[in-house]
Amino acid sequence: MAPSYDQPYSVLLDRNIYDPDNLCEGIDLRRHHAADLEDVGAFRCQEDWRRLVGPLERPFRGGLGPQFSFITVAVPNCIPERMEITSYALEFGFIHDDVIDEHIEDADLSDMEEGLEQGAKTGSIDERGASGKRVIAAQIMREMMAIDPERAMVVAKSWAAGVQHSARREELTNFQTLDEYIPYRSLDVGYMLWHGLVTFGCAITIPPEEEALCTEFLTPALCAASLVNDLFSFEKEKNDANIQNAVYIVMKEHGCDEAEGRERLKARIRQEMAKFVQIVKDTKTRSDLSDDTKRYIDVMQYTLSGNVVWSAQCPRYNLKAEWNELQMLRAKHGVAKYPATFPPADGSMDHIWKKGSTQGESKGEKRKRQSVNGTNGVNGTNGVKKPTISRVGVDSLQLNEVVSLALSTDLPNLTTDVVLQPYAYITSMPSKGFRDQAVDSINNWLKTPAKATKKIKEIINMLHTASLMLDDLEDNSPLRRGKPSTHNVYGASQTINSATYQFTHATALAAGLSNPDCLRIFNEEINELYVGQSYDLYWTHNIICPTFGEYLRMVDMKTGGLFRMLTRLMTAESPLNGQISDSELNPLGCLIGRFFQIRDDYQNLVSAEYAQQKGFAEDLDEGKYSFTLIHCIRTLEANPSLAGEQMQLRALLMKRRVEGKLTNEAKREILDTMKKTQSLEYTLEVLRELHTKLDNEVGRLEKKFGDDNFALRLMMEMLKV
C-alpha cells in the first residue's frame, strides 16, 4: 500500500484560487502554520547582510511575499523549529545569487566555496579574518548544527556544490530552442542548495545509494520549476540586454509574440508537472526505495505548487507588488522591535511546536539522548562500549586442557571483525559517491533491476576502496581524504589482508549475479586493473617516463577498468541485453576513466583541497608519472634551451627515489619548471577537450537509447574544471 504522510504543520488551500492557469494540476497547495517564522528568518538575514557586507534594498526582494513567502507554501512540511534558520539560509542564497548576477567581480565565490567546503568537512566555518558573507555562512552552520548536525552537514555539502557550479559554469546565451535551454537553466535553478534545505527542514536523510536516483526522479520537477521562474520573471527581465528567459527563447524559436510565447511555455510547464505527478504516484508504491526517499519525492511536489503561487505575487518578480504591513514595519524598524508571532501566546499551536521538536531529532541526537541514562541501544550501557573484539577463551597451561582443545572440532568461531576493520576505517571517510551516481545515471538507459544494481554498486565500491588501500600502501601515501592512510593505522600486513578479502567478497557477489557472463566480465576487468597498476609501479620504481600512449593505455586498464566493468555488468543484467552489446558503453567508460585520472593528476598539483586531503603535490612525493609531469619532461627533452631545467628535474626525481619523498621547496621547484613548460595549462586544455568529447558521447548515447540523461549530464557538469 502506498504510504500517506502526516501533514501536521500546514493547512490545505484551494489551489484553483491561486493557480488560475492550472499549471500544477494534481498537486495540492498547503500553507505552513509557522509562516511568520519564515519572515523573521529572512529579515534577520537582510539585517546581517547590511551590517556585515554592505547596502541592500529595504526590504530586499528575495523569498518574501505579501500573502505567501516562499518556504511557507513550498515546504509546508518544514519542522517549525527549523523554519527560521531555513528561511535565513534561503534568503542568503537569494541575496548571494543577485550579487553574482549583477556584480560577478564582487561575489567572492572562492571565499564562499572554501568556507562551505570547510563546513561540509568539519561542521563549522572559520571566521577569523573572513569576509562578511563567510561570517553569515558560519552563523547558518552554527544554528543548524545546534539543531541537527547530521543534516546540517548535508546542507553545507549541497551548498558548496552549488557555489562551485556557479563559480565554474560557462555563460551561454545563444540558445535557439527551448530544448537546448532547459538543461542549462535547470542546472542553474538552485537545486543543490534547495536539496540541502529541504532535507534539513523536513528531517529527511537520503541514503547515498539513492541520491542519484532522486536527482533523476526530480528531472521534470527541476524543469518545471525553472520554467515557472522564467514565466513570472519575464516582465522584469524582458528589456535586459542579455536576456536569458524561456519566454524569449520560445518567441524566438516559433516566431511568435509574447502572449503566444507565454501560452506555449505554460503548456510545456503543465507537461513537466504531469510527469512529476506520475513519478510521485509511482514512487509511493515502490518497495525498493527507502521511506525517506519516498517522503522526499512527496515533499518536493509542494515546491512546484508553492513556487507557482509564490511567483505570481512575490515582489521579486512583480515590481508593482506591495509588502504587507508587518513586513514593512520589520523592514523599517527591525525584527527586534517586531519579533515572531509564532507560536501564538494562546497556546493554540503548542501541539505542533512540541511535535516538531522531537520528530525532527536526528539519529545521532536520539542515540546521544538515550545514552545519558540507561542502555544506549548499541553494545553497552550509559555510553560505555564493550570491547569490539573478545578473546576466544581463557588461556590454560594444563596439558590435558590444551590437548583437548587441539583435538576439538567445536572451537568458537572467529568473526570477520578483524579482517574488516581496515576496510571499515577507510569507508568511514567522506566520499563523493561518483561511482554510485554513475551506476544510477547509466541505469536511466539500461533499466537494470534494482537488486542487480545494488549488487553491482557493492562490487564496484569494494574494488575501488580495496584498490585505494593498496594504492596508498604501494605509493607510501601518508593521507587519504585528510586522515592517516589505512596502512599508517593498521600496518601494511593487515591492510593487504583486508583489501584482498574485499576482492574475494566482490568475486562472490559477481558470481551471484543472474547472468553467468558476469563472472567472466569481472575476471577480465580485474586482470586489466592489475596489469595497468603494474606498469604504474614499474615506471615509478625504475624512474622511467612513459610515452603519452603508454600512460593512456595504463589509465584505460587501471582507472577505466572499473567504469568499464560497471557498464558491462549492468548491460549483462539489463533487460536490453539482447539488443545491445556489452561494449556499447565502452567508449563512455574509457573517456570517463581518462578524464578522471588526468583530472586527478591536475588537481593533485593545483588544488588546495587535494593538498589538505592528500598532502601538497603528493604525486611528486610518490614519484608518479602523471600526465602533467610527462608533458613537462617531454617538453624539456624537445627544447635544448631548457637543458638546465631538464638536468635539475632529473636530479630531483632521483633524489625522491633515494629519499622516498621530496621537500616542499623541491616540489615548488618542479612546479616552477612545469610553469615554464606550460604543462599545467596544457593539461587543463586536454581536460576541456575530453569533457567536450564526453558531452558528445553522452549525446550519442542519448540518441541511441532515445532518452535524455539529465543525471549523467549533471554529474559531468560537477566534474568540470
Curated annotation (Swiss-Prot):
Q: Where is this region: Geranylfarnesyl diphosphate synthase?
A: 326-721
Region listing for (7Z)-ophiobola-7,19-dien-3-ol synthase, in residue ranges: 5-325
Pfam families, A to Z: polyprenyl_synt, Terpene_syn_C_2
Tell me the GO BP annotations in alphabetical order: alcohol biosynthetic process; mycotoxin biosynthetic process; terpenoid biosynthetic process
Summarize where Mg(2+) 2 binds, as residue positions.
D97, D101
- Which residues does the record give as isopentenyl diphosphate binding sites? K432, R435, H464, R481
- EC no. given is 4.2.3.145, 2.5.1.29, 2.5.1.81
Reactions performed catalytically = isopentenyl diphosphate + (2E,6E)-farnesyl diphosphate = (2E,6E,10E)-geranylgeranyl diphosphate + diphosphate; isopentenyl diphosphate + (2E,6E,10E)-geranylgeranyl diphosphate = (2E,6E,10E,14E)-geranylfarnesyl diphosphate + diphosphate; (2E,6E,10E,14E)-geranylfarnesyl diphosphate + H2O = ophiobolin F + diphosphate
The UniProt comment on domains reads: The conserved DDXXD motifs as well as the NSE/DTE motif are important for the catalytic activity, presumably through binding to Mg(2+).
Q: Which family does it belong to?
A: In the N-terminal section; belongs to the terpene synthase family. In the C-terminal section; belongs to the FPP/GGPP synthase family.
Q: What is this protein called?
A: Ophiobolin F synthase oblA
Q: Which organism is it from?
A: Cochliobolus heterostrophus (strain C5 / ATCC 48332 / race O) (Southern corn leaf blight fungus)
Q: What is the lineage of its organism?
A: Eukaryota, Fungi, Dikarya, Ascomycota, Pezizomycotina
